[in-house]
Amino acid sequence: DKGERDKVMRENGVGYKWDHAYYDGKYYVYFGALPVLMYYMPYKLATEADFSTYAGVFINISVFIIFAVLFVRAVLKRWFKDIPFVSYILLTQVLISSSGIIFAMRKPDLYAMPITMALMFAMAGLYFWISAYECKTKVMQGVRLFVGSLCMALVAGCRPQFLVSSFLAVPLFWNNVFKERTLLSKKSWAHTLVFVLPYVVVAVVVMWYNYARFGSVFDFGANYNLTTNDMTRRGFNIGRMPLGFFTYFLQLPVVYAKFPFVAATNLSNSYMGVTVAEAMFGGIL
C-alpha cells in the first residue's frame, strides 16, 4: 500500500526504490531480463559505461519497422498477390502507426524498452513464420520456423503479456497442420521439433528465473511492484471494462494545427475508483 509505505518512510527517514518489485527483503526488476542481456550488460562490460536507454528503444523501433515492412510484404505475397503497390505502402503505414511505437518514440524511457523489444521480436517472429514456407528447400523452411519461434519465445524475456501474439500461429499454420500436414505431424517431425524447441528452452530458462526470485515458475513479480497502488489487491474489476473499451477503440484523437498535430486525449471519467492509465492518442477505430 503506497500510503503505508510513505508513512513508514516519513517516520523512519528511509526511502524505497520506486517501481521495483520488493520480495522477501530484496529488490527486483519485474520487467523481463532480456534487454539487460542484450544491451546493458554487454555495453557495460565492453565500455564500463552505462548504456543509453534512449538508444536501445530507437534500435528496437528501427528493427521493428524493418520487419513490419517485410511482414506486410510476406502477408500480401502469400494471400493477396494482386494488391497494388500503393496499397502495400498504405497498409505498412497503418501497421506501423497503430503499433504504439510513436508513443514510445515520444517517451523512450525505461518502460518503453521492454515493450518495444517485445514488439520487435514479435514482428520478426511473425515475418519468419509467414515466410517460412516460401522457401523452396525444407532446410530453409526449418531454419525460418526455428528463428520465428525463437523470436516469439524471447518475447517472454521482454514483456510476457505480448506472448498472446504467439496465438497467431493458429490461423497462420492452420492449413499446414490440418490440410497439408507439413507441421505437427509424424511426417513433418523435423519441422515440428524446430518449431516447438525454442519455446521449450526459453520457457525453462524464464521459469527457472522466476522460481529463483519469487518461488514460483509463473510469478514474474509484477504483484510486488512498489508503485501508486497495491498491486496484490488490484484484481479484475468489470466496472473498468467500459472505460477501457471506449479508450482503446472509440476515443477520438485531439487534433491541433501545429506539428505533430495530435495530442494526448483526456481520460476524465465517472468511474468511482482508481484507474491507472497512460496517455493515449485516440482509439483504434
Residue ranges and their predicted role:
Residues 117-137, 146-152, 166-169:
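Specific aromatic-rich, kink-prone transmembrane helix
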Residues 94-126:
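Membrane-interface micro-motifs in multi-pass membrane enzymes
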Residues 97, 112-114, 120, 150-161, ...:
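Transmembrane helix irregularities
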Residues 165-203:
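Perimembrane helix-loop-helix junctions
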Residues 69-100, 120, 136-144:
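Transmembrane-helix signature of polytopic, membrane-embedded enzymes
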Residues 15-59, 77-82, 104-108, 264-278:
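Juxtamembrane segments of multi-pass membrane glycosylation machinery
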